[in-house]
Amino acid sequence: MTIALTHLQRLEAESIHIFREVAAAFAKPVMLYSVGKDSSVLMHLAMKAFYPAKPPFPFLHVDTTWKFREMIAFRDQMAQKLGFDLLVHVNEDGVRDNINPFDHGSNTHTHVMKTVALRQALDKYGFDAAFGGARRDEEKSRAKERIFSFRNAQHVWDPKNQRPEMWKIFNTRIASGESIRVFPLSNWTELDIWQYILQENIPIVPLYFAKERPVVERDGMLILKDDDRMKLRPGETVENRLVRFRTLGCYPLTGAIESDADTLEAIVGEMLTARTSERQGRLIDRDEAGSMEKKKREGYF
């Protein structure tokens, strides 16, 4: 008897297959846990893939020290609730040099506190495969990246040297020092993510739900004043608006959207009519043309 799977069931099955393939083929995998909605879905799928056992790999959070406070609280809450092995890495050199998004700009801050920090962590622990929650519908450089994305010993991605992935057969062979970035959510869309979160009742950071929040209008974006480190420019004022976030990152570099969607059902309804990418809320994507591909070539996820 043939069982017809729904769209979400097919995506779920593909992602679970990818998790198990990596666990079987690599010596020391890790899952990057950014605490956002995609990471929450990824974590849920990882738990399903190996149930009733726990995932056979740790979860790594690269802390830039500028994440939303609610993200950090949620991260610690989920680690305690689910009991997974959580590793937190901070680029202490960047902290010592006081690298921050206000004084050094988004490009330098992202490179030092995210890209370099990630490379440090992967080298420190010797991970040979790293799961991430990137999706092809997010951004053009991610659209052309393979599910199993090869990186050389310097963590560099070469888009002209990607491995074929015909018939869902993945090449897992690597030499010493090389690694693979793995994206089980490659074929998911933002709408798929939200419909799956609703279907599975997956916990997410409250910042995704609309609420009155103190924001500053800057460079066409609504920036949440999350703590006293937020430096106001001349003429700027903080005002409370009903906003939520479609994407999460470092709070000075992440724009909110005006919305009254305060339930999962309302968010799904909003996504059904959305005509813009969630990445429009990321200041780091505005650094320069092709900025995401440049960052990925340097080792960014």
Swiss-Prot record:
Domain of life: Bacteria
Catalytic activity annotation: sulfate + ATP + H(+) = adenosine 5'-phosphosulfate + diphosphate
Subunit details: Heterodimer composed of CysD, the smaller subunit, and CysN.
Class of this enzyme: transferase
Species the sequence originates in: Mesorhizobium japonicum (strain LMG 29417 / CECT 9101 / MAFF 303099) (Mesorhizobium loti (strain MAFF 303099))
Gene3D superfamilies: HUPs
Purpose: With CysN forms the ATP sulfurylase (ATPS) that catalyzes the adenylation of sulfate producing adenosine 5'-phosphosulfate (APS) and diphosphate, the first enzymatic step in sulfur assimilation pathway. APS synthesis involves the formation of a high-energy phosphoric-sulfuric acid anhydride bond driven by GTP hydrolysis by CysN coupled to ATP hydrolysis by CysD.
Alphabetized UniProt keyword annotations: ATP-binding, Nucleotide-binding, Nucleotidyltransferase, Transferase
Alphabetized SUPFAM superfamilies for the sequence: Adenine nucleotide alpha hydrolases-like (SSF52402)
Region entry Disordered, spans: 279-301
Nucleotidyltransferase among keywords: yes
PANTHER family according to UniProt: SULFATE ADENYLYLTRANSFERASE SUBUNIT 2
One Pfam family per UniProt: PAPS_reduct
GO function terms (MF aspect): ATP binding; sulfate adenylyltransferase (ATP) activity
Protein name: Sulfate adenylyltransferase subunit 2
UniProt keyword annotation of Transferase present: yes
EC id: 2.7.7.4
Pathway as given in its UniProt record: Sulfur metabolism; hydrogen sulfide biosynthesis; sulfite from sulfate: step 1/3
Membership in a protein family: Belongs to the PAPS reductase family. CysD subfamily.
Membrane-crossing segments per the record: none
InterPro entries, alphabetized: PAPS_reduct_dom, Rossmann-like_a/b/a_fold, SO4_adenylTrfase_ssu, Sulfate_adenylyltrnsfr_sub2
